[in-house]
Regions:
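Active-site-adjacent "subsite" loops/lids of carbohydrate-active enzymes
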Residues: 28, 34-59, 128, 133-184, ...
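Polysaccharide-binding and catalytic clefts of secreted carbohydrate-active enzymes
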Residues: 74, 81, 146, 152-302, ...
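Aromatic-lined carbohydrate-binding/catalytic grooves of carbohydrate-active enzymes
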Residues: 71-107, 210, 305
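Conserved aromatic anchor
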Residues: 441-453
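Recognizes extended acidic, P/S/T-rich segments that occur
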Residues: 457-501
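Catalytic domains of carbohydrate-active enzymes, especially glycoside hydrolases
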Residues: 56-85, 188-192, 302-306
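Substrate-binding cleft of secreted/luminal carbohydrate-active enzymes
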Residues: 291-317, 331-426
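Beta-strand-rich modules
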Residues: 464, 496-519
Length: 529
């Protein structure tokens, strides 16, 4: 009873916070999560090998994906490469230790293949999240597989303190390895996207003759400053990954999630006369510390989206959420790309002045996340609002009955399904419409649509019989209204819920990897179109 009263009180507070929320949620919005495997943060809870461990790991993943489906999440970013390892059978990397307890040990199954399959069963996109460069967070002795020892012997690695170690971004073989790893994932698995996080060069790497990469810089820089030289190598890696994806499966969405502040007047912002720099007090530390220049990736059109980690609240003194969100919305639109914000679950309450620090999200500040979603929607200039939540375990309560951020988001922001924003800068094949759509015993069926390796999904709508086809259309001209959107399916059939099996007509649309939705085909519609 006390938990129910507490949850009710939280909802009242959030309602007061969010009086400005739109009456209807947008049809187009990315809703995603970071599904973290490094240190087994989100998954798996069970570490080991053998039939019992495998069954437990699979069940944990299925339970998690059920939670995400219940929250109307549109994609899951599954971490498949955290420290130059793999959560799948790789030709280039050893198996991760975070699955079995020992690096290089085959678990006897393929978590990425399973995650893709289970996501798609639930109508959720599966994106492969990779850390491109990181090798170790605790020294050279951490990993001792033959693969890792070979990398040490052959000079692949770079560090400034002997503890945090990365692949050397300036080495051609390192760049090629990253491209090859991405290629094997994009070619070998039906992933819908690829996402890099915010780790590039080792933090605080020297920029003088004491630097570990100074000899290479001196021999190959052609007069560039060492900072520009390092950033250029990161930029080249990003471009080569993007080019590979375009040549392989161009409907796979590719983006990066850098630190939140970039494009300031004193760093990269000065390059663009028509793009006002990011105007917050917080520094653009990543530009000269880890040599990350996110605005350059937008300018060079080597990513489809940017997802800066705006892990600060709307009231933060030096890095407030609103102005940073507004800047990235402008920057992404300026260069013809998408901006989806990355949020930190629990960050708001941890930084409230005078508030005691606590583990996990505080129900008293759940409204902060609703305000951030509203900012995304308000500032988008190209109908491409979106959110990626870190870490996804913070979205739902640890115990039955607990209040959770996900409950609040579901009530005020995500109470209808959404489609991801449309990729408008690529030429997509015309997949047309489904054929032979029919309804029998509560199951909608239609012929499968295929076009090479193109991602093909379907949207299913259930519209009350009293609503005409014309009245069911969205006011902004984007097909049928999202309030009638019943499901997204990767299969060419769908079991209707019992409450939707009578009193409705139905529509099925082809929905591709670029998020284009094609002409609806109706079933049991009696009126005029």
């Amino acid at each position: 009873m006390k938990k129910n009263l507490k949850l009710w009180a939280v909802m009242v507070l959030v309602a007061l916070f969010c009086g400005s929320m739109n009456a209807e949620n947008p049809k187009r919005e990315l809703r995603s999560v970071w599904y973290t495997t490094v240190s087994s943060m989100d998954w798996p809870k069970t570490i080991g090998v053998g039939a019992e461990a495998q069954a437990a790991q699979k069940q944990e993943m299925c339970d998690y994906l059920d939670e995400m489906k219940a929250l109307n999440i549109t994609s899951v970013c599954f971490q498949v490469r955290s420290e130059s390892d793999a959560m799948y059978k790789s030709a280039y990397c050893p198996w991760t230790s975070y699955l079995t307890g020992e690096r290089g040990v085959d678990p006897g199954w393929d978590p990425l293949a399973f995650c893709v399959e289970e996501c798609h069963k639930r109508g959720i996109e599966c994106w492969a999240w990779m850390n491109p460069y990181r090798w170790s967070r605790s020294g050279y002795d951490r990993w001792t597989t033959e693969h890792d020892m070979e990398m040490q012997r052959d000079g692949w690695l770079l560090s400034h303190d002997g503890k945090y170690i990365t692949l050397n971004p300036a080495l051609d073989k390192c760049r090629k390895r990253i491209v090859d790893v991405c290629r094997e994932v994009v070619e070998g698995y039906a992933v819908d996207g690829v996402l890099f996080d915010d780790y590039f060069y080792p933090n605080n790497l020297a920029q003088d003759s004491t630097a570990a990469d100074y000899a290479l810089y001196n021999a190959t820089s052609n007069g560039m400053s060492i900072g520009d030289w390092r950033r250029a190598h990161v930029n080249l890696m990003v471009k080569e990954v993007y080019d590979m994806i375009q040549a392989t499966r161009p409907d796979v969405r590719f983006g990066i999630s850098p630190a939140c502040v970039a494009g300031k007047a004193e760093t990269s912002g000065a390059r663009y006369a028509d793009l006002k720099p990011c105007d917050v007090k917080a520094p653009d530390w990543q530009y000269a510390t880890i040599f990350s220049d996110p605005v350059a990736w937008l300018e060079e059109k080597s990513i489809d989206f940017i997802s800066p980690q705006i892990y600060w609240a709307t009231w933060h003194e030096t890095a407030p959420y609103g102005p940073i969100c507004e800047y990235w919305s402008r920057a992404a639109n300026y260069f013809g790309r998408h901006f989806y914000s990355s949020h930190s679950i629990g960050s708001a309450n941890k930084r409230v002045k005078g508030a005691p620090r606590r583990k996990g999200p505080d129900p008293a500040v759940f409204g902060e996340y609703v305000k951030q979603v509203e900012a995304n929607r308000e500032y988008t200039l190209n109908n491409a609002s979106g959110s990626i939540y870190f870490s996804s375990r913070g979205l739902y309560g640890r115990n039955p009955g607990d209040a959770a951020v996900g409950d609040t988001l579901m009530k005020y922001c995500y109470n209808t399904l959404a489609l991801n924003p449309v990729i408008t800068w690529k030429k997509a094949p015309n997949l047309g419409e489904v054929s032979n759509a029919s309804l029998k015993k509560g199951v909608l069926n239609w012929d499968k649509v295929e076009k090479g390796r193109s991602i093909v999904k379907y949207t299913i709508y259930a519209v009350p019989n009293k609503v005409s086809y014309a009245a069911a259309m969205s006011k902004d001209g984007d097909g049928l209204d999202a309030k009638y959107l019943l499901a997204i399916s990767y299969d060419n059939k769908y079991q209707l819920p019992k409450k939707k099996q009578k009193g409705h007509w139905y529509a099925v649309c082809v929905y591709d990897g670029y998020s284009n939705e094609f002409t609806p085909v109706t079933v049991n519609y009696k009126g005029k179109k």
